[in-house]
Amino acid sequence: METWKTNLDETKKRYIDWWNHKGIILNMWEHFQEGVKPHADIPAPSPAKDLNQKWFDPQWRAEYLDWYVAHSSLKADILPVANTQLGPGSLAAILGGVFEGGEDTIWIHPDPDFNDEIVFNPEHPNWILHKELLKACKAKANGHYYVGMPDLMEGLDVLAALKGTDKVLLDTVMQPEVLEQQMQQINDIYFKVFDELYDIIREGDEMAFCYFSSWAPGKMSKLQSDISTMISEDDYRRFVQPFIREQCQKIDYTLYHLDGVGAMHHQIGRAHV
């Protein structure tokens, strides 16, 4: 790679230290552009015709992200990463959830035909969209920046997006054995999806993640369980912890996004997943 970030090697060293629990990373969630000298003469695309083009047109997004990264600050440990997110928890859309583009985000609504079967359809348009978006961005990047892994998410959060949060919470009581089986099915599909997307975006063994603009020398992912604010510690240990543990065992570099103080009671006193 010949990226637009002149101090990338230094940042990589700091990331490797950070993954080994040493030092800090001076980064930010997104990029800023005020006062930035462009890294390349990349023109902005024509404004999106509508929200569908803004989010779900791979070529338009690739052109926009190419312009965006070229005009963004890459100082300190800010990484050159194209944010390819298709909404938080887009694995749910791959499994049948319904996309809706908003002004500032992408919403994923439950599958109206969901019947408790977790099925991966390799011909599903939302899965094809993920791959086409990443391929378009990778071609446009031309080695100048990383193409970030979308925020697939996992486990109960994916099922809640696919089925509805209230129904998943009832399942912890009404059909816990079925729920456990669904968690394993989602995990199995997660690894298949993750590996295929990783092979599209990887730079050697390296990759970047779209959220947190984070980097690792191998496979990495951000893990979380937002719904955990609404379940007991026993349910967390049964329906969340085993499957996050499996992700940590199979993915080289992982970080846990503790989204809200309500989820902290699952972590206090537990140093290891």
Predicted regions and their residues:
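Active-site loop segments of alpha/beta catalytic cores
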Residues: 1-51, 62-63, 68, 72-84, ...
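A contiguous, low-structure linker/loop signature
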Residues: 81-116
